[in-house]
């Protein structure tokens, strides 16, 4: 327990809160070629690589991911949710925050049904999360 005098000399430091998705908090001024502070719920980007990766132990699968260059020129790894996708290199995608627990380094999700990303076909439940239209009938 510090004395009052010690606290006067060197006050307590408050904890710095770190963002879970830092690339969404950076904008880019292309005219001045500088990064700016600009928080956004989603960001647009171009897929530079689409592939699969294996999760950490004890899980086993081939999880789909895309490497995306955002509109603020930052490159991030984003997860492609749902069964099947139509993404390829140079597809324009929308990303949101949200990590994938068993994929190290994946802190973003691609929004299905937005821009070049198609919704999940034949999905009946939880459709809004996968950009699926309401079935006829």
Swiss-Prot record:
Keywords: Methylation, Ribonucleoprotein, Ribosomal protein, RNA-binding, rRNA-binding, tRNA-binding. GO terms for cellular component: small ribosomal subunit. GO terms for molecular function: rRNA binding; structural constituent of ribosome; tRNA binding. It comes from the Bacteria. Belongs to the universal ribosomal protein uS12 family. Part of the 30S ribosomal subunit. Contacts proteins S8 and S17. May interact with IF1 in the 30S initiation complex. With S4 and S5 plays an important role in translational accuracy. This is Small ribosomal subunit protein uS12. It comes from Streptococcus agalactiae serotype V (strain ATCC BAA-611 / 2603 V/R).
């Amino acid at each position: 327990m510090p004395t009052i005098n010690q606290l006067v000399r060197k006050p307590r430091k408050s904890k710095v809160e770190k963002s879970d998705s830092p690339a969404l908090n950076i904008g880019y001024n292309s005219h001045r070629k500088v990064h700016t502070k600009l928080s956004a719920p989603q960001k647009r980007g171009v897929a530079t690589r689409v592939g699969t990766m294996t999760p950490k132990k004890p899980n086993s699968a081939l999880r789909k991911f895309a490497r995306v260059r955002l509109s603020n020129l930052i490159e991030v790894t984003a997860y492609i949710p749902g069964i099947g996708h139509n993404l390829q290199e140079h597809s324009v995608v929308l990303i949101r925050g949200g990590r994938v627990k068993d994929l190290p380094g994946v802190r973003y999700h691609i929004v299905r049904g937005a821009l070049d990303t198609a919704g999940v076909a034949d999905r009946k439940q939880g459709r809004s999360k996968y950009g699926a239209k309401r079935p006829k009938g």
